[in-house]
């Protein structure tokens, strides 16, 4: 897990002016995350360790269930900040919006999902996927594009020698696979381990290890919000960085116990198959 989190060490602000927080600011940040996963451990650690509270920030966290939905929340004003794939900011910019969305901090530098199959494959190799159907997620999203890149690198092309299924919404990929669709699916934790525990799947590969480093998940907000809340966003990133330092200097059991309150009803992270 810690290898996937080292990207947070490189958190940085984009090159734009930071304005002071407006008068009467209550310190609340409404944050919509693309999915709820231990992949974003620094965020939950910062919440549970009280780092945001120390900075006078209150996080109101909601789960978008996909980058498209998280971006919709930001654009509609239902969320102040979105945590999602950077491609969504590009899509919005290309629409020609005047108050477009900007990335102000990077959280991860790899795909954090895992390829899940229907049988255990201790010696899994991407060269053995010819003729298989893989549930990719939403076309144009980071999970789908990253997996497509891996498959293309191994000579697979949709409709020629493999089926890349883009018809399933991001937050329904796990249940759809569990119900019998596809031979493989890409899933984040804790969903991947939940399927393993239910006997409905087996983790066979780390997508992030196979794809290499890419700017995968980032914090973003509208240009106007960033201009009006520069100091608050800097304090927000400071908390994320501080939580990252905690994770990098404590053992897995300690980190898992810090994360546990953010995953009520879920088997402890240290018992998950990919931990």
Residue spans for each PLM region:
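Second-shell loop/turn segments in exported
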Residues: 132-137, 179-182, 224-227, 242-248
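Short, glycine-/small- and polar/acidic-enriched structural segments
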Residues: 27-169, 176, 183-189, 200, ...
């Amino acid at each position: 897990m810690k290898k996937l989190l080292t990207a947070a060490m490189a958190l940085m602000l984009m090159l734009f002016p930071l304005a002071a927080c407006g008068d009467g600011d209550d310190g609340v940040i409404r944050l919509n995350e693309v999915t709820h996963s231990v992949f974003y451990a620094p965020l939950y650690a910062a919440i549970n360790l009280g780092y945001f509270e120390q900075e006078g920030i209150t996080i109101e966290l909601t789960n978008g269930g996909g980058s498209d939905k998280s971006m919709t929340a930001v654009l509609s004003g239902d969320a102040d900040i979105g945590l999602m794939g950077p491609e969504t900011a590009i899509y919005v910019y290309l629409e020609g919006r005047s108050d477009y969305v900007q990335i102000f901090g990077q959280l991860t530098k790899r795909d954090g999902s895992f390829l899940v199959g229907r049988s255990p494959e201790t010696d899994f190799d991407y060269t053995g996927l010819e003729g298989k159907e893989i549930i990719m997620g939403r076309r144009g999203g980071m999970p789908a594009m990253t997996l497509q890149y891996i498959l293309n690198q191994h000579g697979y092309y949709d409709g020629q020698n493999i089926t890349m299924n883009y018809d399933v919404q991001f937050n329904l990929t796990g249940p759809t696979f569990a119900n019998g669709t596809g031979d493989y699916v890409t899933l984040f934790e804790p969903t991947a381990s939940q399927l393993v525990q239910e006997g409905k799947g087996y983790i066979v590969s780390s997508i992030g290890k196979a794809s290499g480093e890419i700017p995968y998940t980032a914090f973003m907000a509208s240009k106007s919000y960033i201009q009006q809340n520069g100091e608050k966003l800097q304090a927000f990133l400071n908390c994320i960085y501080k939580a990252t330092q905690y994770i990098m200097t404590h053992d897995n059991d300690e980190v898992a116990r810090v994360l546990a309150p953010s995953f009520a009803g879920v088997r402890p992270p240290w018992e998950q198959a990919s931990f």
